Amino acid sequence: MLPLLLCIVPYCWSSRLDPRASSFDYNGEKVRGVNLGGWLVLEPWITPSIFDAAGAEAVDEWSLTKILGKEEAEARLSAHWKSFVSAGDFQRMADAGLNHVRIPIGYWALGPLEGDPYVDGQLEYLDKAVEWAGAAGLKVLIDLHGAPGSQNGFDNSGRRGAIQWQQGDTVEQTLDAFDLLAERYLGSDTVAAIEAINEPNIPGGVDQGKLQEYYGSVYGIVNKYNAGTSVVYGDGFLPVESWNGFKTEGSKVVMDTHHYHMFDNGLIAMDIDSHIDAVCQFAHQHLEASDKPVIVGEWTGAVTDCAKYLNGKGNGARYDGSYAADKAIGDCSSLATGFVSKLSDEERSDMRRFIEAQLDAFELKSGWVFWTWKTEGAPGWDMSDLLEAGVFPTSPDDREFPKQC
């Protein structure tokens, strides 16, 4: 069991509340949001400097904190949490016409388990984020991004490698963490939704039946603390419409699907016209076929996997043939680091066109949450950079390439 946490910042929300209507209508309004990736859950490709400073064996937050030790890890991560995001970022999001921010958090923020090398302290900053978002008029979707044992084997779960979630007590431990998260935050009108777990990997071995049981338990926890909060379920890398008929009652369940074009050998080889056709087809075939609201909770402007460490620290890229034994499609030298200002005019125009197509496609259903707000330099992935460069529309309705879907 995880220890009970009390409020430690200037405000505190009641854990027992009268039911309220959702503070956002996911059936009627369009979600227009961005993720705060790489902040409270680290990813090597978003902040490579943190991982490079710890040596070659630091490939995820687990190994990073294990190598550094508790004291040094607390010092370095606290400095990162304090400096990476500020209140001004949330105002910039609002000024760009966004209405949501999705904030990943790991189970260890609620209290690391015995034997974990992780450090906690993230909740102080999540509290600040909710406050800043509310002041800017944004809604928050809190996302449980990492579960004990790893639900997908990706470094963004905290620990890459084997999928061990659903083994031993890991599901019960996850529910303990989720309960504490819900108790702490679901009293805030700013927190419109909470996500049960990020990217549970059914093709990779997560049992769908047990996942559905977990989703049911999460639904009960949310009802316990605030029946008006929407519950977000990841599609588990299955077609989102395959979840039709599951938890369709009422209007509080929202499905989350993630759509990327660089982790598939067929998609990554496409030209820009084919990328746009594919994203429009995805929306018509899958999003519009769902019986529940669906947000595309992760997507981006990049069409290659060239960003440094995107496939994991120490791994290469499909695009230039350095990942596994894939055939090279192109050159990653201008796409691995840096910002979109160094791209050619044609590359920036194609990226804007692709972004606009995705905005159109995803708003055929319930909307979108871009991945991610900020990086140390990953062209196409950094919304703050894309906005500044005019590659992402400065208002979500602005179009240089209208009606692509």
Curated annotation (Swiss-Prot):
It comes from Aspergillus oryzae (strain ATCC 42149 / RIB 40) (Yellow koji mold). Pfam families: Cellulase. The active site is at E199, E298. Its main location: secreted. Disulfide bonds join C280-C405, C306-C332. It comes from the Eukaryota. Its EC number is 3.2.1.58. One of its GO terms (cellular component) is cell surface. It catalyses: Successive hydrolysis of beta-D-glucose units from the non-reducing ends of (1->3)-beta-D-glucans, releasing alpha-glucose. Keywords: Carbohydrate metabolism, Cell wall biogenesis/degradation, Disulfide bond, Glycosidase, Hydrolase, Manganese, Metal-binding, Polysaccharide degradation, Secreted, Signal. Belongs to the glycosyl hydrolase 5 (cellulase A) family. It is found in: Secreted. Its cofactor is Mn(2+). GO terms for biological process: cell wall organization; glucan catabolic process. The gene is exgA. Monomer. This is Glucan 1,3-beta-glucosidase A. Transmembrane segments: none annotated. Beta-glucanases participate in the metabolism of beta-glucan, the main structural component of the cell wall. It could also function biosynthetically as a transglycosylase. It is an enzyme of class 3 (hydrolase). GO terms for molecular function: glucan exo-1,3-beta-glucosidase activity; metal ion binding. Residues 1-14 form the signal peptide. Induction: The combination of poor nutrition conditions and attachment of mycelia to a hydrophobic solid surface appears to be a major inducing factor.
